[in-house]
């Protein structure tokens, strides 16, 4: 089970995970050093649980899960991926994204973690969380503050979306059963999931209407339902 950027294994506390599920912190989070690049982090995660055959990932964790499916095309039987992205298509798009991420990296290094978190949480992609109880939002805020500014900066610099290769060609060859979960209000990631379902032979799309990007936080029962299921045919 792979968490999102600024998250942690605690992000999954409200889910009902399978027995013996492992949820490692990702590179740059907690005390885990940042990996040199996207594939290095994929290979680090693959080595942690060489016998695992099921993946659950959210956002950054979903992107890394797609990397695992691409790197080890016959290893996994099933994946449940929330708000996944297969990577940007062109060098130009990746350059633009790296420029955007560089602003966050400078903010982390020059202004510190609390100011970065305030800016990060002000993004429109989290607006659907306004309806959540204040205690839930406060817990998420505290979780983000458990990291270090340098750790998150190095995470963005190594496995941010601008550092991720385009995985579409490799994923089109995947034999894994994949359930893509996405919020109906999260248009960018809904389009990405629709595209992935069109190219991956055993992929299915499930939309949580009236919800946004972080379905793990907003509707954990929806996510748990798919965690409990076996692979689709």
Name each model-derived stretch.
Residues 208-220, 224:
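Catalytic histidine-centered segment of alpha/beta-hydrolase-like enzymes
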Residues 174, 180-182:
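Short beta-strand/loop motif that positions the catalytic acidic residue
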Residues 70, 77-109:
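Flexible "cap/lid" loop of the alpha/beta hydrolase fold
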Residues 187-193:
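Conserved alpha/beta-hydrolase "acid-adjacent" motif
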Residues 10-16, 22-56, 225:
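Active-site loop/oxyanion-hole signature of alpha/beta-hydrolase fold enzymes
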Residues 4-7, 59:
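Active-site glycine-rich loops that stabilize anionic/oxyanionic intermediates
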Residues 57-61, 65:
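Gly/Ala-rich beta-loop-alpha elbow adjacent to hydrolase catalytic centers
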Residues 95, 110-170:
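Conserved alpha/beta-hydrolase catalytic His-Asp/Glu region
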């Amino acid at each position: 089970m792979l968490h999102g950027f600024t998250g942690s294994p605690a992000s999954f506390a409200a889910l009902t995970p399978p027995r013996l599920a492992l949820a490692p912190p990702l590179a740059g989070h907690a005390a885990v050093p940042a990996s040199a690049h996207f594939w290095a982090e994929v290979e680090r995660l693959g080595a942690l649980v060489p016998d695992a055959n099921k993946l659950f990932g959210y956002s950054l964790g979903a992107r890394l899960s797609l990397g695992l499916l691409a790197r080890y095309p016959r290893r996994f039987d099933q994946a449940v991926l929330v708000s996944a992205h297969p990577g940007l298509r062109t060098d130009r798009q990746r350059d633009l994204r790296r420029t955007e991420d560089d602003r966050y990296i400078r903010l982390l290094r020059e202004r510190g973690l609390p100011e970065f978190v305030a800016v990060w949480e002000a993004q429109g992609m989290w607006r659907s969380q306004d309806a959540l109880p204040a205690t839930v939002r406060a817990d998420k805020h505290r979780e983000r503050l458990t990291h270090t500014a340098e750790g998150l900066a190095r995470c963005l610099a190594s496995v941010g979306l601008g550092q991720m290769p385009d995985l579409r060609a490799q994923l089109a060859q995947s034999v894994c059963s994949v359930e893509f979960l996405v919020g109906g209000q999260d248009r960018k990631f809904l389009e990405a999931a629709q595209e992935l379902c069109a190219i991956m032979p055993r992929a299915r799309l499930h939309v949580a209407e009236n919800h946004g990007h972080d379905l793990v936080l907003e509707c954990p029962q929806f996510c748990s339902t798919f965690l409990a299921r076996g692979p689709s045919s």
